[in-house]
Amino acid sequence: MKISIIIPVYNAASTIRRAIASVDTKQNYEIICINDGSTDESRTVLEQLQKEHPNITLINQENKGAAASRNKGLAHMTGDVFMFLDADDEFLTSRIDFMADFYQKAEDVDIVLGQIAKGKHGEWQPIYTHQEIQKLEKVELAQCPDIMQSIGPGGKMFSAQFADLRFDEDVVFCEEHCFIITAYKKAKKIQLLPNIVYGYNEIEGSVTNQRAEQFESYMLDALKVRTRVMDLLSSKDERTYYSYRMDELIVSYLLQAYIEKNNVITKKLLDSVTTYINAMQKTDYSGKAMFRIIKVVEQGSKKWSKALYQQWRETLLSVGIGRPNYYRFKVEVLPKRAKSRGKMKLKYYLKR
């Protein structure tokens, strides 16, 4: 069996060698590195690695983003299965072959899904919210919507039958969701593994800061992706679970990152959130996710004017969610703000 490893590379000169060194399979394999217009020494490092490893294919392109880079890799892969690896991440020792064994011994398995851990090189912590899929079992999306908890490209081995799928190139936030959900829907069986197979090297603060800085465009991307995924999903259970995954675990924390940084309620913020809430009403959604978004906005922000609160209150009333009048809001809700912010900050770090 031949394994294709697809690695998008952008300004990863300091980490790409470690990432490639983690590809320790005994299977026949190819590594496809897509240099996405790097402005550091990534290309030089990759050219040197290509001399050292004849099974590395290097593709250079203008900067187009991770989605376009992965799509380029998919177009060039020749393996029976494929996997994705980010240039600053790594496979854990012997885990590629561990996954390959499960793939090869079951004809009905089209995807092998291992666990991802976050942290710094060698100091891995399992992702808290992935507990429901930490088991040795073959599942389908319809019976186990929880697999949408693992919605990124890492830690998975895909059958080559999915090589014609593509990542969304018109968004930069959550661009992997449609690809992953479509593959889950098409797969005959998905083999879950309780073992950590992939290490995500997290740079403290970088993700939070980026999300806060790109808040407006990320909210637009999230809404676009959410609409597409909801159209893909077949049942209310699937759509409600995806709402939890997207609306609560992604969008509400995107909001929280922005509010933690800016700490003031603005019309721009309210317009983004109310647009998103109105869109949620058009699909099945998680009530818990909805109320977390509301809590983040109300108890995380300050300097609410009467006019802004009235806009907010009318939006929620229009979707059947009652809110107190402005004066009761100031007396009953805002005093909870300081206590709530401490709790939300703790939960934020646990959920990441």
Labelled PLM ranges:
Residues 7, 28-37, 57-62, 86-87:
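Short beta-strand/loop segment that forms part of the nucleotide-sugar
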Residues 197-203, 210-239, 248, 252-280:
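Catalytic core of nucleotide-sugar-dependent glycosyltransferases
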Residues 22, 35-45:
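A conserved acidic beta->alpha catalytic loop
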Residues 82:
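Short aromatic/hydrophobic "clamp" motif used to bind/position activated sugar donors
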Residues 260-352:
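Membrane-interface aromatic/basic loop that binds lipid-linked glycans or pyrophosphate carriers
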Residues 61-77:
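Glycine-rich, basic loop-to-helix element that forms the pyrophosphate-binding segment
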Residues 11-27:
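Short, well-formed alpha-helical segments that are part of the catalytic scaffolds
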